[in-house]
Curated annotation (Swiss-Prot):
NADP is among the record's keywords: no
Task performed by this protein: Dual-function toxin that inhibits both the serine protease trypsin (Kd<30 nM) and voltage-gated potassium channels Kv1.2/KCNA2 (IC(50)=2800 nM).
Domain BPTI/Kunitz inhibitor span(s) in chain numbering: 5-55
Name the UniProt record assigns to this protein: KappaPI-actitoxin-Avd3b
Keywords: Disulfide bond, Ion channel impairing toxin, Nematocyst, Potassium channel impairing toxin, Protease inhibitor, Secreted, Serine protease inhibitor, Toxin, Voltage-gated potassium channel impairing toxin
MF annotations from Gene Ontology: potassium channel regulator activity; serine-type endopeptidase inhibitor activity; toxin activity
CDD domains found in the cross-reference section: Kunitz_actitoxin-like
Keyword Membrane annotated: no
Family label: Belongs to the venom Kunitz-type family. Sea anemone type 2 potassium channel toxin subfamily.
Positions of the record's site feature: Reactive bond for trypsin: R15, A16
GO annotations of cellular component type: extracellular space; nematocyst
Superkingdom: Eukaryota
Compartments, record wording: Secreted; Nematocyst
Length: 58
């Protein structure tokens, strides 16, 4: 699995409201979260499809 997918979900420090997806290593699924718009980490994908492709979800 891509190491970025193992990072914890991080909403970032800003207060915007961007719908994004992250890989949840507990459920082994990509799940939606609201990204604040700055900082955060690499476990942050624009689409469910991108998250599933990068993180190998079947």
């Amino acid at each position: 699995i891509n190491k970025d997918c193992l990072l914890p979900m991080d909403v970032g420090r800003c207060r915007a409201s961007h719908p994004r997806y992250y890989y949840n290593s507990s459920s082994k699924r990509c799940e939606k979260f609201i990204y604040g718009g700055c900082r955060g980490n690499a476990n942050n994908f624009h689409t469910l499809e991108e998250c599933e492709k990068v993180c190998g979800v079947r």
